[in-house]
Regions:
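The conserved beta-strand core of Leucine-Rich Repeat
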Residues: 1-408
Length: 408
């Protein structure tokens, strides 16, 4: 920088220094602040840090391990947490999370737990709890917060799989830190005044069925996007709380939680039309959270009549074709679908149904498998159903087919 080491740098007015900072990236702001003490004082001017994107956790990488990132996180949140308007926190996965599972003839079988991997996961969990406490603690009194986005890791930060309840008990005895995290979120929501975007996906122990009740009336009236995705058994969004969100235009939740009652509420004439609906269907959870009571064909018709521009995104994880055919109603305005599975086959009948019912709305189709035996096309077929799907869906712009080949 031309002014580096010059007396002139200290003589510049604060307004001009802040204006210079406004043209720099976050990293360049930090470098420029080393010019002198006066520039460092201007570094934390609120208008310069309206948005903060943080990625923490995971294994060792060029940016350090998850625990090594904690002091940096504390520094940023201590200086910006009280006034930042948009905060995005992403927890990255630990390396090697797939090793506890092994595919056997199209099935997933548990193998012996790796002690070293388990230790890494426990360390990641401890770090996760500390970092989430830090973030929520620093924004608890932020009344200007407009966007809060928390994204965890589906494979690690869940009280299931390789991290069972006994492991979690060792990390957080009595659930003290989890309870503290939940209380901090309640304070964040109750103190908020302008939240327009609230999203929490796969964040262990952060959101409870009672969390939305603490949302202030001001934020309830301004909220436009709500995303609550988790594998918890109780529904995180109740009709009573959803009724308060009259300006909601985008909603993301578990497919099993999108009940007929919620659909009727969203189709009401005293609220803003819904533009985007994202639904996650987890096949492994269907036994505990059945599809009974989810939106029917008539419910979808009423919702689309009220929200003419509604588009739906469905992510199906390890869902059998029978359950897929059950939820893919004709009136569902499907725009994007992501089929990701390790132990179930995507049948040609499912592909044909999608191609026929959603030929005028489907724009994104993603098919991911962990073996080479998909889709199940049968033996007497001349037409490839994937080719027919691409041909029939006139607005299809993204087609992704991913196969993980394994050596025999």
């Amino acid at each position: 920088m031309a002014l580096y080491g010059c007396v002139g740098a200290m003589a510049l007015p604060s307004e001009l220094i802040v204006h210079i900072f406004s043209f720099l990236s976050d990293r360049d702001k930090l470098r420029a602040s080393s010019v002198c003490a006066r520039w460092r004082e201007c570094l934390f001017y609120p208008s310069l840090w309206t948005e903060l994107k943080l990625r923490v956790g995971g294994g060792a990488n060029r940016e350090g391990s998850g625990s090594e990132q904690t002091p940096r996180l504390e520094f940023l949140m201590r200086n910006f947490g009280s006034f930042v308007r948009e905060l995005h926190l992403e927890v990255t996965p630990v390396d090697g999370y797939l090793s506890p599972l092994s595919g056997v003839e199209g099935r997933i079988e548990p193998v012996e737990r790796d002690p070293q991997l388990l230790d890494r996961w426990k360390d990641a969990m401890i770090t996760y709890l500390e970092q989430v406490l830090c973030v929520l603690g620093c924004i608890r009194n932020n009344r200007n917060l407009q966007k809060l986005s928390l994204y965890g890791d589906t494979c690690i930060l869940q009280d299931e799989g390789i991290l069972d309840s006994a492991d979690l008990q060792q990390v957080d005895q009595g659930g003290k830190k989890i309870k503290e995290i939940q209380q901090l979120l309640v304070e964040v929501l109750s103190n908020s005044r302008k939240i327009k975007w609230l999203s929490s996906a796969f964040m262990l122990g952060v959101v409870t069925p009672c969390s939305l009740a603490s949302l202030s009336n001001h934020s309830a009236g301004s909220l436009e996007h709500l995303g609550l995705l988790d594998n918890q058994l109780p529904c995180l969004v109740s009709p009573v709380e959803l009724e308060r969100l009259v300006h909601l235009r985008s909603l993301a939740l578990d497919f099993c939680d999108f009940t007929s009652e919620l659909s009727h509420l969203l189709a009401g004439g005293d609220r803003a039309p819904l533009h985007r609906l994202s639904l996650m269907l987890n096949g492994a959870a269907l036994e505990a959270k059945p599809l009974d009571g989810t939106a029917s064909e008539d419910d979808w018709k009423a919702l689309v009549q009220r929200s003419a521009n509604l588009r739906v995104y469905v992510m199906a994880l390890d869902v059998c074709s029978q359950d897929l055919l059950r939820v893919l109603k004709p009136s569902l305005p499907l725009e994007r679908i992501h089929l990701d599975s390790y132990s179930t086959l995507v049948t040609d009948g499912t592909l044909e149904l999608i191609a026929q019912q959603y030929n005028k709305t489907l724009s994104h189709f993603v098919l991911m498998r962990d073996d080479t035996g998909f889709p199940d096309l049968g033996i007497n077929r001349n037409e490839d159903p994937l080719v027919l799907l691409a041909w029939r869906c006139v607005h299809l712009s993204v087609l992704v087919i991913h196969v993980a080949f394994s050596s025999v």
